[in-house]
């Protein structure tokens, strides 16, 4: 049996969460956009890259919302153009990401795999603003109370890529989910389960 955390979180954040067994796990990160195998560091099994110009346009729209911050994800590092200092500490120490600060989003030094709106007042408030503008370009999902994530992958496509990389049939996969970003994964897995504490 192979255990694989599937999350909107970054690879390094997941490794910290699962520290006692981190080297034994496979990882589906950034809502399916980045896949890592076991060991330390794990082998990169796949990544799904966003078109840069459109991703940066989305990042600018998020920055234009006064109560939101934009977090741009590469494979191993998240990038932030912070409006407030406390968001840096939150992402670095509470979320546990490897984090770099950018002067502007155009300074993003690597491929973009995910763009996230961090909205402490609630992602459901900004989803109706951003979602319809980008739904024909990127997948988007509410990923926890404060996060609205955009990328070209989702946990379902990530699971399919992971199954191919590991030579596992989707019907042999058991998946557990509790939020909207889990729906594509639950649809792709042979044995899906919704947690009791799932979002309504």
Regions found by a protein language model. Give the residues of each.
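Short, polar loop motifs at secondary-structure junctions
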Residues: 32, 196-200
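Short, structured coil segments at secondary-structure junctions
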Residues: 20-23, 31, 133-136, 188-189
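Active-site phosphate-binding/coordination module
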Residues: 1-87
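Conserved acidic, metal-coordinating active-site core of Asp-based
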Residues: 61, 67-176, 180-188, 197
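Generic anion/oxyanion-binding catalytic loop in active/binding sites
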Residues: 3, 44-47, 148, 175, ...
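Short, well-ordered beta-strand core segments
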Residues: 27, 192-194
